[in-house]
């Protein structure tokens, strides 16, 4: 796990994602870079906006990209204004050059949720798995629609939403609690962990306890985001307010890793340091970290 604390975390996250997209070279055996993506809302909204901005400038293309949406509300029309399908097509997919057949969103009107979720998992496998997944985290540590108590090994499935979630949806959508969707189709935590690389955003003081429990506490189903401790290539992108509940020692430690990585790698992306195969670089990195921690 890596943690970076940025003054503009969404800009950092967007640039990191664009680098991954531009580094991808399609081949006969691997035609598409596969993204797992959240909805166009909250902290992710600015990332999508920046992707659109850079696409219009010609700095990034989505022709060789396939996407899998993290979740979708169940039993609402695809044209409903709250549907992920409507929101994502209106604000992102219709603007960039992604091929429609490479956009995958769970069917909100399916009559057989079990079959739909199995087919969704099968489609991910057909593409060779998710290469890069990014998401935000709820103040309770929820990931997609995996709320506290969710199985850490869960797959894509139908999930009843907690009353706290319904109240937040009610406030955000300006509807009564009785009017908001109460069930959703969602990628499971096990499905999410299968992604080759994961980037998670923690923004604002309201996410500080979730960050603390995700990093400094044990892996626990009551904080779903803590499961990211088990992933070998997971990056947490935070602002300073989100670190308020973490110990200063932990924050200094991860800031130190970032600074040393920048010193050693120069213009290389410091987030790529974990992939470095240069033994001398790794030895130098560890020596510097040990000397700083004395």
Residue ranges and their predicted role:
Residues 1-36, 53, 268, 294:
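N-terminal glycine-/serine-/threonine-rich phosphate-binding loop
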Residues 33-43, 47, 123-148, 269-290:
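A glycine-rich beta-strand to alpha-helix segment
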Residues 144-189:
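Class I SAM-dependent methyltransferase SAM-binding "motif I" and its flanking Rossmann-like core
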Residues 115-117, 143-149, 154-156, 210-214, ...:
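A short secondary-structure junction signal
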Residues 190, 194-294:
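ATP/nucleoside-binding phosphotransfer catalytic cores, i.e., glycine-rich phosphate-binding loops
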Residues 37-39, 69, 106-107, 134-137, ...:
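Short beta-strand segments
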Residues 49-61, 84-90, 148-158, 217:
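A glycine- and small-aliphatic-rich helix-loop capping segment at beta-alpha/alpha-beta transitions
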Residues 60-134, 254-269, 273-277:
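Ligand-binding beta-strand-loop-alpha-helix segment within the catalytic cores
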């Amino acid at each position: 796990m890596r943690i970076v604390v940025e003054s503009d975390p969404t800009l950092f996250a967007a640039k990191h994602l664009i680098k991954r997209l531009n580094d991808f070279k399609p081949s006969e055996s691997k035609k598409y870079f596969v993204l797992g993506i959240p909805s166009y809302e909250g902290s992710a909204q600015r990332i999508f906006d920046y992707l659109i901005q850079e696409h219009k400038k010609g700095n990034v293309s989505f022709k060789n990209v396939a996407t899998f949406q993290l979740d979708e509300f169940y039993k609402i029309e695809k044209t409903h204004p709250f549907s992920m399908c409507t929101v994502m097509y209106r604000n992102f997919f219709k603007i960039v050059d992604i091929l429609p057949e490479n956009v995958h969103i769970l069917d909100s009107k399916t009559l057989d949720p079990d079959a739909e979720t199995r087919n969704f998992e099968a489609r991910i496998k057909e593409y060779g798995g998710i290469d890069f997944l990014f998401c935000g985290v709820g103040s309770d540590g929820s990931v997609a629609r995996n709320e506290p108590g969710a199985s850490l090994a869960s797959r894509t499935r139908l999930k009843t939403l907690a009353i706290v979630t319904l109240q937040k949806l009610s406030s955000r959508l300006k509807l009564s609690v009785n009017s908001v969707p109460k069930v959703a189709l969602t990628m499971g935590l096990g499905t999410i962990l299968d992604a080759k690389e994961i980037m998670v955003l923690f923004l604002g003081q309201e996410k500080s306890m979730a960050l603390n429990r995700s990093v400094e506490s044990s892996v626990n189903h009551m904080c779903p985001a803590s499961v990211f401790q088990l992933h070998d290539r997971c990056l947490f992108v935070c602002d300073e307010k989100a670190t308020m509940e973490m110990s200063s020692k932990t924050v200094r430690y991860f800031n130190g890793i970032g600074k040393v990585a920048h010193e050693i790698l120069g213009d290389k992306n410091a987030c790529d340091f974990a992939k470095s195969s240069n033994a001398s670089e790794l030895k130098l990195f560890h020596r510097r970290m040990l000397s700083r921690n004395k």
